[in-house]
């Protein structure tokens, strides 16, 4: 399917895009991959293997000639993608993974692609030596590569463990990492009793230490998928995790071009390739960057910490406008009223904010915000309401404004208590952390200290906002 006949470009919702700061740097391997893409109809003549302008990023893809804004700099045909459907069609996957009933082993799309990559990497059956994607697999990091993912990798070195201790003293980050690690450990335990057991039974006689190799390859594969895959690159592609060869070699820049889908002129809904557009005029030898967020959806820009947990780095380069965030979570608990109508009114009001009894409500507090998020205040007002408060919210149609002085006092006191505890959890002052940064520390410790500084700032900011909101409520004459 030749791509040069296509002019329709569809900008895509990009949620979970890739990064390769330390990928395989052998030029011939990348050139072989580019040659494959060209043979399949991809646009790769604009790029060559070069060196990144990002400190420590190593290899990059650079332009061989100037290109104007809006040009497709590089594209990859659809049949080169590694998708959920590809993984589930693999014979080894069918026999040793998908043969387990869902109640024993539920395999979502990301796990399917992860296990497929693991099997291809280990080449247990010998079939991977002739894999269609062999040139792509060769471009991936080696099995012993250390990804900068704290939930999986930082415990492996003394330097990493010291940085992890600092990172875990940041309350929001600690909560997130503990959850990620717990989910990983549960997955590993379930896989050992099912997939790994099945593979070990079938191939241990020909592959020494297979169980150990499976565990190592799974962590490697999970790290690759986490840092390189796209979520929902297009509605026509099933699954939440898709690997796009070549495009996952691009380094990240917030000013870079987001992933685009190229469709046939006469069939706009039929996609045949994916690529990256030039967001400005670019010159010879300039690096091709990818942006990790929907370029037309500023409200869906990931927070700095989201980038770190997902891709292993802090996006601090250039004029990034990414916010630092603090994930605040609390269970939704409400009293049961004597009047059924009041109970229904409360449930309907909560539903407007995608909340319901028994849920764990999560909200991101962002550094620099002028006040607390409406969703946080509204949900808490509804949670601590009595029947009189609910009746008032029902008459208004919402709980965007304080309902009563008693109600608002409970709301603000709840947030104050939580954020005071979070601030007390942080052992040092911001000044101490900044001085340590200024004196010079390793990269992992620098990341941990920066995150702790900003989480502390958000705790202090939130407590100040609560004071202002309380003073405002006290001055409202209609509140009793």
Show the residue positions of the predicted features.
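Long, positively charged leader/targeting segments at protein N-termini
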Residues: 22-80, 84-89, 104, 120-480
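Secreted/periplasmic proteins
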Residues: 108-111, 298
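Short amphipathic beta-strand segments in non-cytosolic proteins
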Residues: 113-116
């Amino acid at each position: 399917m030749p791509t040069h006949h296509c002019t329709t470009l569809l900008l895509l919702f990009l949620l979970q895009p890739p990064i390769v700061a330390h990928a395989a740097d052998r030029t011939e391997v990348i050139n072989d991959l580019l040659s494959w893409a060209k043979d399949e109809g991809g646009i790769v003549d604009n790029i060559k293997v070069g060196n990144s302008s990002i400190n420590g990023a190593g290899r990059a893809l650079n332009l061989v000639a100037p290109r104007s804004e809006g040009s497709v700099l590089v594209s990859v045909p659809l049949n080169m993608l590694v998708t959920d459907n590809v993984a589930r069609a693999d014979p080894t996957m069918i026999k040793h993974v998908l043969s387990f009933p869902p109640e024993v082993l539920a395999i979502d799309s990301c796990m399917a692609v992860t296990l497929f990559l693991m099997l291809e990497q280990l080449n247990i059956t010998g079939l991977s030596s002739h894999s269609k994607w062999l040139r792509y697999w060769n471009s991936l990091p080696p099995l012993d590569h250390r990804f900068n993912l704290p939930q999986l990798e930082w415990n492996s070195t003394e330097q990493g463990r010291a940085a992890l201790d600092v990172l875990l003293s940041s309350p929001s980050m600690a909560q997130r990492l503990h959850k990620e690690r717990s989910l990983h450990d549960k997955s590993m335990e379930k896989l050992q009793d099912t997939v790994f057991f099945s593979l070990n039974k079938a191939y241990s006689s020909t592959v020494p230490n297979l169980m150990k190799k499976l565990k190592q390859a799974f962590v490697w594969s999970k790290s690759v998928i986490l840092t390189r895959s796209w979520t929902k690159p297009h509605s026509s592609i099933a699954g939440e995790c898709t690997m796009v060869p070549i495009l996952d070699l691009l380094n990240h820049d917030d000013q870079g071009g987001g992933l685009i889908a190229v469709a046939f002129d006469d069939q706009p809904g039929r996609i045949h390739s994916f690529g990256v557009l030039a967001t400005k005029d670019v010159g010879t030898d300039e690096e091709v960057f990818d942006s990790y967020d929907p370029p037309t959806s500023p409200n869906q820009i990931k927070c700095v910490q989201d980038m770190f947990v997902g891709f292993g780095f802090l996006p601090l380069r250039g004029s990034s406008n990414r916010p630092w965030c603090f994930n605040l979570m609390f269970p939704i608990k409400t009293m049961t009223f004597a009047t059924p109508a009041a109970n229904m009114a409360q449930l309907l009001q909560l539903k407007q904010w995608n909340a319901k009894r028994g849920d764990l409500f999560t909200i991101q507090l962002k550094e620099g915000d002028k006040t607390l998020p409406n969703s946080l205040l509204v949900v808490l007002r509804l949670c601590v309401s009595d029947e009189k408060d609910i009746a008032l919210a029902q008459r208004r149609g919402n709980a965007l404004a304080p309902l009563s002085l008693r109600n608002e006092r409970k709301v603000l006191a709840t947030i104050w208590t939580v954020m005071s505890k979070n601030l007390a959890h942080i052992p040092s002052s911001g000044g101490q952390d900044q001085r340590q940064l200024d004196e010079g520390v390793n990269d992992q410790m620098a990341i941990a200290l920066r995150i702790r500084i900003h989480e502390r700032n958000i705790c202090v900011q939130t407590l100040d906002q609560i004071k202002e909101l309380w003073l405002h409520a006290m001055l409202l004459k209609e509140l009793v």
